Every structure is written in structure tokens, then in C-alpha cells.
Amino acid sequence: MAKGKVIAFITVITLAFGVSAIDNAVAAERIAGRNVKHNVKWEQIEIGDEEGHVIAVYENKGISSRTDGETSLLWECGILDMNLKTGVGSGNGYGTTTDKAGDKMYWTWEGKNVGKGTWEGTWAYTTGTGKFAGIKGKGTFTSYAAAPQQSYSDWEGELELP
């Protein structure tokens, strides 16, 4: 009989802890926005296997605006493996958005060129500072060339803070 009471007590405690954990869980928030960027650095190396094939390292700066009105400074860099003549290529890189208080969100991206001047891919938060410490989230983006050294990306995804 005592064994049955212990099992019942453990079950009640486990159930209470489970309900508490569910209650304290933070649901991921759906977010979306646009990044407007200006290229400040571009270095490329010709591969030579076909005309226009290069490996490039770049740096962009700009503004990130969310659909909820939040804006941040944006910094982004990456490595591209692409053909400048055909537009075919892929890439990956890193970025940082910094809000007005100086808190930062760090993220990675990877994608591919889906047409001349248009890229599609995925992004994911890696870490954050200040109110973004412990950030989690990921999403998708489509990036468009707007003019020489100018581009913008429309993005959406999820953000979760502890």
C-alpha cells in the first residue's frame, strides 16, 4: 500500500512539473521584415574553369525593418561561389542586427541564386546579447539586386526568447 502511495505521489509531482514547464514555455513569435543593404566590400578570385566563375567575399551594411515596426542596424558578410555571367551560384555567411539599445542578434545564412540577381535561402539565429541573450529562431529569405552595390531581402521566420 505504501508503494502505491509513493507511485501516486511521484505521478502527481511529475504531472505538476510538466504542467508548470508547459506554462513557462515561450512560444515562438512569427516575424517578418525587409533588410536594405549597401555593399561596402567585395573581393573576388577568378576560378578559371569557365568564364565568369568566381569565389567572392563581401561585406554589406544597412537597415533591418520588421513588419511590427522594429528597426535595427544590419551588418552582413559572406562567401559566394558563383558564375557572374550566368548568375548561377551558392553562398553562406553571417550577420548581426543591432537594436537602438545596442543589443545584438547574430545569425547565419545559406542560399543559392535562383535567377540573375535573385537569391533564396535560409537563416538561423546563433546567439545574442542583452535582451537577445539565448535567442533561438530560423526562417527563409529572398534577396534581390536593386542597383549596383544595392540589394534588399524580404524574410520571415520565428523568434524565441527565453
Label the model's feature ranges.
Residues 1-10:
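Bacterial N-terminal signal peptides that target proteins for export
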Residues 10-20:
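Bacterial N-terminal signal peptides
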Residues 24-162:
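Beta-strand-enriched cores of mature, soluble protein domains
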